[in-house]
Amino acid sequence: MEEYRGELLAPAGTMDCLKAAIAAGADAVYLGFSGFNARTSAGNFDADSLKEAVRFCHVRRVKVHVALNTTVYGTELAPLADAVRAVAASGADAVICQDLAVAKLIGEIAPELPRHGSTQMSVHTLQGALELKDLGFTRVVLARELSLPEVEAITRNCGIETECFVHGALCMCVSGQCYMSAFLGGRSGNRGSCAGPCRLPFEANPLPEGRPGRLHHLSLKDNSVIDKLDRLQAIGVASAKIEGRLRTPEYVAAAVNACLAGREGRAYDRDLLKNAFSRSGFTSGYLDGKIDGTMFGVRSEADAELTRKTLPALRELYRRERSRVPVKMKLEIEEGGEKLTVTDADGNRAFAYGDAEPQPARTDPTESLQRSLSKTGGTPFAVEKIDVEMDGGPWFVPGSAVNELRRTALEGLQQKRETLRPWPVQEVELPPLPQRTLPPHRTLRARFESWDQVPEQALSGLEALILPIAQADRVPRAWRSKTILELPRVMFGALEADTARRIAATQEAGFAGYEAGNIAHLRMCRGLPLSGGFGLNVTNQLSAQFYADHGLNAILILPEVKDSDIASIAPVQNGQPVPTGVIVYGHMPLMVTRACPLQNIHDCAHCDKTGLLTDRKAKKFPVRCGMGVRTIYNPVPIYMGDKPGALTVDYGVAYFTLETREEAAAILDSIRQHAPFEGEFTRGLYFKGTN
């Protein structure tokens, strides 16, 4: 039996890319369903073209994974349900999803359709992967930032398939936690419309006021770990994924070709792969655990020129149909005619009958007949075995007649393989969206980065304080009953175990509860008082209700959601409303990153864990390092303190990060008094929304 080498999964932004991937040798493709995938500017597929794609792939033993991996607004839930039905009708092999509303609808409409957790779910820990398993997911796409030992620890213990990116672009931010494109331009990366701001100038060097940044200190080189495919395979990774649904057929074919060679231990043309697309080379820093300034790079004009010169050679990689479906043939010849039977490994069978009058042969024609039947070039089929039976022979059959038998039988087999096999669907009626009214008393919560920021009179007029769990020991016992401990949105390396220890140490310490920022926290805090932070990316009623059903006692709505959509989010628990909230003040964390942009100018030994990034408009974005990650903040804070009735929620959160204790006290006073903000501020996306 042939050794299973794991799935090679290629991007298919268009039908041309899909065909290039298959011709180059991909085992599976992933593509986006129009309107609900994380690459809206790719070609994408509607209900009809998806069926065409599935037919084309399934004939060739290639699986199709459909991306429905965006956050969804309430008004989109009905079209989303239609999209789920369309995917089920196509017979595609799996759905990749981010929003738990998508997962919930698949479970209700097409419960047998496999669900894969998108990298947009920010799963980077064993606890997160185990939670997805409990929720019925069959595969998780792991975060790109993981090292090989971290991938291994998850893969060997999570009980579901893991999928890892092995080649292609690297986002600067942890996927699913990037809000930069949305807040700077209204194009949400969580909704597939990222404008790519990290490819623009953001300079870490200290610059005087007014001078624009010119260097690209947020731009990472493309990831390439093809040389480590054998190690990923050895630890049990089920799927090696190539990123690039916005790339060309030539790029797709080059990446597939290189990955096939890497998987089989063969040499591949590294220069050809680099010339297909690179940003001044590749990096394997994350998987190697070597995260430093060498990971950064930009696409130069020289890179683009090399790509243009290499296009003819790249096109040769997918010019011919690859014979990849093994078939067995049986040719029966008797005095009255011929019969050819063709079968594949999936149990499909096709027949062809000839009316050529066989003539007695002087010598045994078996080898000649087998040679004619084995000529399957230009088709998806490769002959594995040919049996020839002659009743009363030997018989001579003209080559043209044998060729016609072969063509007819293979066409019949192809038609059978093209037959769609839809997933069973159930009738599901979506409940009408709730329309909340403004509660009579909206409360205020305040989140602080450090206990040093907390004003002495902070509890006055506040429903709750929120502090990172690492600050728990600093909270006086008298304050703890109103203090919620925030869990880190990202827990790379030892931080997952450290967070678990801190949860265990604080359970009986008198705190009000915990705030989740990642799906892993549901499992880590099972049975404990738990609310939801913005890192859960709640944007609609179904996802909010999911979290309420799993025990969350309050939910902070993602600040990308528009006011009218906020009003339709009203989860309940045991018949009682679950409070929802919004950020009413704060420098929005636009990115959380594992690679450090400050390493472009100095190493960690010479860094005080703070910095500024200056963009091309001379705006300065604060950077703070801690807990194994770097957070990049919006230089302009959200402020809604003077608009107390604008957003239909139960509580507001003043989200303090960069402020001093005195500044925090003054801002809290302004919010309580509904006073205008003194200084530059933004209303965020509450009134204009995103794409």
Residue ranges and their predicted role:
Residues 104:
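A cross-family signal for key residues in well-ordered alpha-helices
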Residues 124:
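Active-site PLP-lysine loop of aminotransferase-like
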Residues 40-44:
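Conserved non-cysteine loop/helix-boundary elements of the Radical SAM core domain that shape
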